[in-house]
Amino acid sequence: MGVAAEGRGRCARGLAVGLYVGRFQPFHAGHLKAIGHMLERMDELIIAVGSAQYSHTSRDPFTAGERIAMIRLALDEAKFDRSKYMIIPIPDVGVHAIWVSHLLSYVPKFDVCFTNEPLTSRLFKEAGLKVEAIPFFDRGVYSAREIRRRILKGEDWRALLPPSVANFIESIGGIQRIRDISRSDELV
């Protein structure tokens, strides 16, 4: 594993560390498979929960705390070693030119950022950081947007999430929340 950029390389213990940034709205089976892939390549993984300040919107229905709980439940259910990852909430700054610096102020040193999102990839590369793509795991199905759509339409959504995450969403009233916040009192 190569050093990401001067001053950002391997941690003091000499371990290869990866970064995975996502909104996880909600955390689904594709995210879980991606984390498995990353942990096969890295000694440790930093999971950054982006847009941490947003919740209760149709695009971002869950709070940062709820998303962290979902990730923890799924990784525990899949028997991932908790010493191999950390989960850190990262609020947005709304300015692309400073977003990477902002994120770096929240996370420990890492070697590589894993992403398939074109803007995220571009911003990290412009900052001189190493970026690697993640293999897509049935992206057409495993998509948070698709899961939220299925919830709204009353279609099967549970099969796309780890069982512990589906149960958690139901336990916090997440289904009704997504339906409520998608409605509007405005005439179209």
Model-derived regions: residue spans:
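Nucleotidyltransferase catalytic core that binds NTPs
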Residues: 2-188
